[in-house]
C-alpha cells in the first residue's frame, strides 16, 4: 500500500539497501501488532487483505524482469494469497540456474516441486508426511519427500532440538544434525525468516549448506 506501515517498511528496507517493488496504493499494507507483557508476547493482531489474480500478474511480470543478476531466490510463503503460482517462480528461476529457497506454508508441498531447498519447521513437515513416529521414520520420510518434490535438500527446523539437514550427494541423501545452544528466548518471531535468509546468503557466497 501507500500507508504509514508501507512508508515505515520502505524506510527500514532502504536503510539496508534493499529495494521494494510493486506498490499498490489501493491495498492496506499487511502488518502485525504484538501485545506484550514484559518480554512475553500475549496476543498478535494482524491487518491484511487478500490478493487478486490481476495483482498476481503484475507480480509475475516484475519477478521475471528483475531476476537477471541474482544469485538466489527466497520464497517465504505466509499463506496470505500473494503467491498464487509458486511453480512459475521456480520455473523462471531454474531457467537462469538460480536456486530457489522456500520457507513453506500449509499442508500441500507439491507446489514447491523443483525448488533447491525447503525449510519447514518440524510440525509443518510432520503434517505434510502424515506424522513422525521415530528418528528413523523421520529420516525415511524426509528422503521420500526430497525424491517426490525433486529437491536438492531439505532443512527441518526443530526448535530446541536444533535443525536437521537432508542433502543429495552423489546419488545418496545424507543427514546432518545441528544442535542448538541453550539461551533464554522471549520472542521467536521471525526465526524461520532468519534461518532461510542466512542460509541463502551464505550458500550464495560459496559456503556449503552444512556450513551455511
Q: Predicted segment positions?
A:
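A generic structural signal for short hydrophobic patches within well-formed alpha-helices
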Residues: 125-126
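Short acidic, glycine-rich surface-loop motifs adjacent to enzyme active sites
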Residues: 69-82
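Conserved phosphate-binding/catalytic loop of the ribokinase/pfkB sugar-kinase fold
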Residues: 21-27, 32-67
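Short, hinge-like loop/turn segments at secondary-structure boundaries
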Residues: 11-14, 38-41, 117-121, 171-176
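Short internal beta-strands
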Residues: 1, 100-104, 120
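Substrate-binding N-lobe of the ribokinase-like
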Residues: 1-31
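Conserved phosphate-binding/catalytic region of the ribokinase-like
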Residues: 66-69, 84-114, 129-131, 135-211
Amino acid at each position: 500500500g501507500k500507508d504509514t506501515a508501507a512508508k515505515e517498511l520502505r524506510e527500514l528496507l532502504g536503510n539496508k539497501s534493499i529495494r521494494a517493488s510493486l506498490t499498490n496504493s489501493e491495498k492496506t499494507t499487511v502488518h502485525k501488532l504484538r501485545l506484550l507483557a514484559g518480554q512475553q508476547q500475549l496476543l498478535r493482531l494482524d491487518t491484511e487483505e487478500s490478493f487478486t489474480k490481476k495483482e498476481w500478474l503484475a507480480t509475475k511480470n516484475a519477478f521475471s524482469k528483475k531476476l537477471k543478476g541474482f544469485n538466489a531466490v527466497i520464497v517465504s510463503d505466509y499463506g496470505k494469497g500473494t503467491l498464487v503460482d509458486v511453480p512459475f517462480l521456480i520455473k523462471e528461476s531454474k531457467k537462469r540456474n538460480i536456486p530457489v529457497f522456500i520457507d513453506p506454508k500449509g499442508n500441500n508441498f507439491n507446489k514447491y516441486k523443483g525448488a533447491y531447498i525447503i525449510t519447514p519447521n518440524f510440525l509443518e513437515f510432520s503434517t505434510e508426511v502424515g506424522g513422525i513416529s521415530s528418528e528413523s521414520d523421520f529420516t525415511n520420510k524426509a528422503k521420500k519427500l526430497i525424491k517426490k518434490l525433486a529437491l536438492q535438500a531439505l532443512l527441518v527446523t526443530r526448535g530446541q532440538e536444533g535443525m536437521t539437514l537432508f542433502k543429495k550427494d552423489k546419488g545418496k541423501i545424507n543427514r546432518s544434525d545441528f544442535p542448538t545452544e541453550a539461551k533464554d528466548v522471549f520472542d521467536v518471531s521471525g526465526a524461520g525468516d532468519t534461518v532461510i535468509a542466512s542460509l541463502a546468503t551464505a550458500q550464495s557466497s560459496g559456503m556449503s549448506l552444512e556450513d551455511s
